[in-house]
Amino acid sequence: MPFLGQDWRSPGQNWVKTADGWKRFLDEKSGSFVSDLSSYCNKEVYNKENLFNSLNYDVAAKKRKKDMLNSKTKTQYFHQEKWIYVHKGSTKERHGYCTLGEAFNRLDFSTAILDSRRFNYVVRLLELIAKSQLTSLSGIAQKNFMNILEKVVLKVLEDQQNIRLIRELLQTLYTSLCTLVQRVGKSVLVGNINMWVYRMETILHWQQQLNNIQITRPAFKGLTFTDLPLCLQLNIMQRLSDGRDLVSLGQAAPDLHVLSEDRLLWKKLCQYHFSERQIRKRLILSDKGQLDWKKMYFKLVRCYPRKEQYGDTLQLCKHCHILSWKGTDHPCTANNPESCSVSLSPQDFINLFKF
């Protein structure tokens, strides 16, 4: 009777015992045997070559299909949890460490840009990454970075808000990429050089779209900003944290120009962003012998960083070392999780992953 070989190297074919020893059973219906061992070996080699070529073809086809899908997709890699555990070293329970790219993929920045409280925070974070941390991201994180940036540009084109902020972000990114592309071959960027050249052309196209944007007047015919009392207008202008916004607002109407030159307004703006010591080092007098707070502000901006304030920020739980957005639930074992959370500025977020 036929015997099935148990050798793990056997291809699983049948063997029968004859007077001359064990021989391979070729065709059960005809009952013929393989007597010529060389012919069998040649056939086996032929079958293996066909199998190998078939596998190579399947793998290549799957890879082309995967690359095509990856090149067309515009969505961020999605994770169900909106938090990430930040660990900087290996332990018995957890090996490896958390990287900036991993945190960037997990914290759902695509949804965060739709929230007006988080928009400026995300844009500032994108700017810091574009300046110095782009090479720290993995290939997937770099792709997510460009996808999120595209969503930011589309949102600005639709809402017609924060145009100058995104212009500066795109210019910063383009300048960084010009430097990094010239160093190709030194493992500074992940991906093909042609892909990064295409991305740079896309950035130039976005810049052109932002430069050509036309602000449309709303159809609303009700009360406008200039119809408000002067004291209320001045109170609203004091809420602006960027001096360039005050200058732009003053160019909108002659009455607003007078308010935008108010010395007390610029004095409070200087005191908000800079310390008394910094202000004393950059005193500027006007022709009338008074402090020119407007000129002092723009000089201080060139010398010192401005104070950053955001409506919503990322928070780090000191108890469980979990990073998440404010108001996002995370598995914390502390009795009072809110007291353990510390707000992180965009720069603090970057520094968190410097080892």
From Swiss-Prot:
It is found in: Cytoplasm; Nucleus. It comes from the Eukaryota. Part of the SCF (SKP1-CUL1-F-box) E3 ubiquitin-protein ligase complex SCF(FBXO32) formed of CUL1, SKP1, RBX1 and FBXO32. InterPro entries: F-box-like_dom_sf, FBX25/32. It is linked to Defects in FBXO32 are associated with susceptibility to dilated cardiomyopathy (DCM). A disorder characterized by ventricular and impaired systolic function, resulting in heart failure and arrhythmia. Patient are at risk of premature death. The lineage of its organism: Eukaryota, Metazoa, Chordata, Craniata, Vertebrata. Changing G243R: Found in patients with familial dilated cardiomyopathy; likely pathogenic; impairs the formation of SCF complex; reduced ubiquitination of cellular proteins. One of its GO terms (cellular component) is SCF ubiquitin ligase complex. This is F-box only protein 32. The keyword Cytoplasm applies. Pathway: Protein modification; protein ubiquitination. Specifically expressed in cardiac and skeletal muscle. A motif (Bipartite nuclear localization signal) lies at residues 280-295. GO terms for biological process: cellular response to dexamethasone stimulus; protein ubiquitination; response to denervation involved in regulation of muscle adaptation. A motif (Nuclear localization signal) lies at residues 62-67. Keywords: Cytoplasm, Disease variant, Nucleus, Ubl conjugation pathway. A motif (Nuclear export signal) lies at residues 169-173. The gene is FBXO32. Substrate recognition component of a SCF (SKP1-CUL1-F-box protein) E3 ubiquitin-protein ligase complex which mediates the ubiquitination and subsequent proteasomal degradation of target proteins. Probably recognizes and binds to phosphorylated target proteins during skeletal muscle atrophy. Recognizes TERF1. Residues 223-271 form the F-box domain.
